[in-house]
Amino acid sequence: HETLDINYFGTLNCIKAIIPIFRKKGHGRIVNISSLGGKIGTFGYAAYCSSKFAVVGLTDVLRAELKPLNIKFHLVCPGEFESPMVDELNTYRTEENRIVTQTVPVLPLDVVADEVIKGIEKDRYLIIPGVIARFLEMSSRWFPSISRVIIDFQIGRVYQGPK
């Protein structure tokens, strides 16, 4: 529950708080932060990915529902970037998780920030920092069966089972 409370319900509560202000102004812009894990499931992160998939779904729906009110949405889905959270994750990753996540390089925070700002300035709805992350998201959307086979193969090479 805690992960959903923070990632999904925290996002929803912030949106609920700002909508009356944007209605009064006649326009607004909301930038929701999900994750590459909200677009592509990641081994070992069921709760996290589920909560971030929920943010993606919420943002997709509200983008359409609130467009008539001139409220724009941006959905940011970064992969891992230099942060205390990633440092902590590295202390307890399973081998299965490590093999899957090493596909996408950990980005410097300033690169992520620059790409997010540029995406907002260019009025992009979906902002995925990093070329490799964008490629993986696109390929998993266009060729989901192939993506699943590749991930299953990678995990199968190192799978150790439940601990």
Regions found by a protein language model. Name each.
Residues 40-46:
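Active-site loop immediately N-terminal to the catalytic Tyr-X3-Lys motif
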Residues 35:
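Residue(s) in the substrate-gating loop at a strand-loop-helix junction
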Residues 15, 51:
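Active-site helix of classical SDR
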